[in-house]
A protein has these predicted regions:
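Single conserved hydrophobic/aromatic residue that forms the stacking wall/gate
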Residues: 1-13
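Short amphipathic alpha-helices in soluble, non-transmembrane regions
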Residues: 30-32, 70-78, 111-118, 144-151
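Short glycine-/aliphatic-rich beta-strand segments at the starts of folded cytosolic domains
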Residues: 14-20, 55-61, 92-104
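Conserved short beta-strand edge segments in small beta-sheet-based binding/regulatory domains
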Residues: 79-91, 120-127, 152-166
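Short, low-order "capping/linker" segments at domain edges
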Residues: 93-114, 135-149, 166-190
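Ordered, amphipathic secondary-structure segments that act as subunit-interaction surfaces
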Residues: 64-111
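Short, charge-patterned binding micro-sites
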Residues: 41-64, 87-93
C-alpha cells in the first residue's frame, strides 16, 4: 500500500482526558498548543473535578497513532497539565448534549412525541416554540436534529463530548503524566 493510504487507514477518533490546574488561562494554553501544531479539535468540554483545584478537559480529535502520541507528549510538557490519558474507545462512557429550539405552531404534540422517542425533554415551551434538551452519543444527537429540521430549527447548540473510563479505573495525578489504552490504535512505545 502507498504510505498515504496506509496512514489514512490507521486514522482513528480518540478522546483524551486531561486533568489541569483550575486556573485562569489554562484552557488558552492547551488550545494554543493544538493550534500552534496544526491539530484540529473535533470536540472540547471543560469542567471542574471532584477536587476544585483541578479541571478535566475532554478533547476529541481524529488522528493517526503518531499524532496522538505527539499530542500527549506535548500536553504533558505544559506545566498546568497534571495528567493526560487517551481513553479506551470501547471502555469509556461518553455523552454530549444538544439544545434545539424549534418552531412549534400546530405541530406541538407531534414534536413532543418525536422528542420522546429520543428521550429528549422540553425545557422551554412558548406559544410559538419549544426548546428540547437531548443527551447521548453523537449519532443519536445527529438523528434527533435531523428529525427536528423539517419543523424549522430556530436555534441550536451542542456541547463537547464528556467522557470517563468505565469501571474502577481513575486518573491519578500522582502517577504517569500520560497513558495509553490497550487497543489497536496504541503506539508501540511512549
Amino acid at each position: 500500500l502507498h504510505p498515504r493510504v496506509r496512514r489514512q487507514r490507521q486514522m482513528c477518533i480518540r478522546d483524551r482526558s486531561i486533568v489541569v490546574r483550575n486556573q485562569p488561562g489554562v484552557l488558552m494554553r492547551v488550545a494554543g498548543m493544538f493550534s500552534r501544531r496544526g491539530f484540529n479539535i473535533d470536540s472540547l468540554a471543560v469542567g471542574i473535578t471532584q477536587n476544585p483545584e483541578f479541571s478535566r478537559m475532554t478533547v476529541t480529535m481524529q488522528a493517526d497513532d503518531a499524532t496522538i502520541k505527539q499530542v500527549c507528549k506535548q500536553l504533558a510538557k505544559l506545566v498546568e497539565v497534571e495528567a493526560v490519558k487517551v481513553l479506551p474507545p470501547k471502555a469509556s462512557a461518553k455523552r454530549s448534549m444538544v439544545m434545539v429550539k424549534v418552531h412549534a405552531g400546530d405541530k406541538r404534540l407531534e414534536l413532543l412525541r418525536l422528542a420522546d422517542v429520543f428521550r429528549a425533554h422540553a425545557v422551554d415551551v412558548t406559544g410559538e416554540s419549544l426548546i428540547f434538551l437531548a443527551t447521548g452519543i453523537d449519532d443519536k444527537l445527529n438523528a434527533f436534529v435531523d428529525v427536528m429540521r423539517p419543523y424549522g430549527i430556530l436555534e441550536m447548540v451542542q456541547t463537547g463530548l464528556v467522557a470517563l473510563e468505565r469501571g474502577d479505573a481513575a486518573m491519578d495525578v500522582s502517577k504517569s503524566r500520560y497513558s495509553w489504552p490497550e487497543s489497536s490504535c496504541k503506539p508501540s512505545a511512549i
